[in-house]
A protein has these predicted regions:
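Single conserved hydrophobic/aromatic residue that forms the stacking wall/gate
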Residues: 190-200
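Hydrophobic alpha-helical segments
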Residues: 1-192
Length: 200
């Protein structure tokens, strides 16, 4: 059991939060049985919390040509590149649920190029990692590779949006030493419906 504080930042009392923020957190708790630490950490800034949740839902929950499991692969691969403990553990948990593969998260976090994934998924992650680490060097050839695997410009936008959003999340989590909940390590106990709620 990790007894360290979950963040360097102050953690608000649930009862002191605006009603809509409190309702969101309580809804997550009802569905999953716990409150992911990121919710309480972000809730200290209600406007940022609302923006965080809205953008998360827009890029992670809306339908596109990329599966929800593949979106989680992007989060895990790019967060690993950014050395983000919180996001690798929490989204690794969701990836195991969504992919129904207990090994995939560790493989992607350690070395996605050697992971048991398709060539299409590897091309997707190559692009995502380049967005996360060296976006200034992205050029036409990167988009041509995506096109070869069936990704269009809107898919490229989604990949880049996920990588960019979580680059921000990774930096906040690292700066304020955010710790993942113990419950994430027992993720296989949760259902796919719960996976929609436990990260953001």
């Amino acid at each position: 059991m990790d007894n360290r504080p979950i963040s360097r930042s102050a953690i608000p009392n649930l009862e002191d939060l605006p009603d809509d923020v409190k309702t969101k957190i309580q809804s997550v708790q009802e569905k999953t049985g716990f409150v992911p630490n990121v919710f309480m950490i972000m809730a200290r800034k209600p406007d940022e919390f609302r923006g965080f949740c809205t953008y998360y839902d827009a890029i992670m929950e809306t339908e596109c040509n990329i599966t929800k499991a593949e979106l989680e692969m992007i989060v895990v691969a790019t967060s690993a590149q950014n050395d983000c403990l919180y996001c690798v553990v929490s989204h690794g948990a969701v990836l195991r649920i969504r992919s129904k593969d207990k090994n995939i998260s560790d493989q992607i976090a350690i070395n996605y190029k050697k992971s048991k994934i398709t060539e299409r998924q590897r091309a997707m992650l190559d692009f995502a990692v380049k967005v996360a680490k060296e976006s200034q060097s992205i050029n036409d050839s990167d988009f041509k590779i995506l096109e070869r695997f069936g990704f269009d410009i809107e898919d490229a936008w989604r990949i880049a949006s996920v990588a960019s959003f979580f680059a921000m999340s990774n930096r906040l989590a690292n700066t304020f030493s955010m710790l993942p909940n113990e419950e994430f390590y027992a993720c296989l106990l949760y259902t796919s419906d719960a996976a929609d709620e436990i990260t953001g």
